[in-house]
Amino acid sequence: MARYTGPSWKVSRRLGISLSGTGKELERRPYAPGQHGPTQRKKISEYGLQQAEKQKLRHMYGLTERQFKNTFNKAGKLQGKHGENFMILLEQRLDNIVYRLGLARTRRAARQLVNHGHITVDGKRVDIPSYQVSVGQVISVREKSAKNSAIAESLEVSSFVPEYVTFDAETLTGSLNRLPERSERAAEINEAFIVEFYSR
């Protein structure tokens, strides 16, 4: 399945989450798109709930179905709880760390920064969004990209940086200090539903 590249507000309203991170797309119309959106009261099956949770998380991180499932399978080979390991692997993606540092307003924009070669890891250019960032690695904006307008605009509006990352706005450099705790990850996601979905 290809990555969705259409309007993110449609997916946000359909799934009931804000993919932009601002919540604006849900303020005026907090229901699925379409003329019958506000009156829909369809009962959802257990399978439907599990699938919806999977779709929420997949779209939140902007992955294709194959990328999503591959990451899920990789998490299953690690010690510990499958769902928790899965969420941590998603958080360790380079595009997500770039987003968490405030260098991009959305994960989609962060993925473009990485794809276009604007980001380095430990001084080396990395253009793979799925690259897994390890604790202690240094993420920087390339010197040639320091005046990128998209990065500058994002830094102007971004104020919250999670405690598990640090960022120096002067040098445009940050790092992953530690793995995020459950309370610091997406509270609106129930990863147990996703584990159940793939266990069927």
Swiss-Prot record:
InterPro entries listed in its UniProt record: Ribosomal_uS4, Ribosomal_uS4_bac-type, Ribosomal_uS4_CS, Ribosomal_uS4_N, S4_RNA-bd, S4_RNA-bd_sf
Region annotation (Disordered) ranges: 22-43
GO molecular function: rRNA binding; structural constituent of ribosome
Keyword Ribosomal protein: yes
UniProt record, GO biological process: ribosomal small subunit biogenesis; translation
Keyword tags: Ribonucleoprotein, Ribosomal protein, RNA-binding, rRNA-binding
Domain of life: Bacteria
Disulfide bonds: none
The S4 RNA-binding domain, residue ranges: 92-170
Assembly mode: Part of the 30S ribosomal subunit. Contacts protein S5. The interaction surface between S4 and S5 is involved in control of translational fidelity.
Family: Belongs to the universal ribosomal protein uS4 family.
NCBIfam families assigned to the protein according to its UniProt record, in alphabetical order: PRK05327.1, rpsD_bact
Function in brief: One of the primary rRNA binding proteins, it binds directly to 16S rRNA where it nucleates assembly of the body of the 30S subunit.
Name of this protein: Small ribosomal subunit protein uS4
Gene field: rpsD
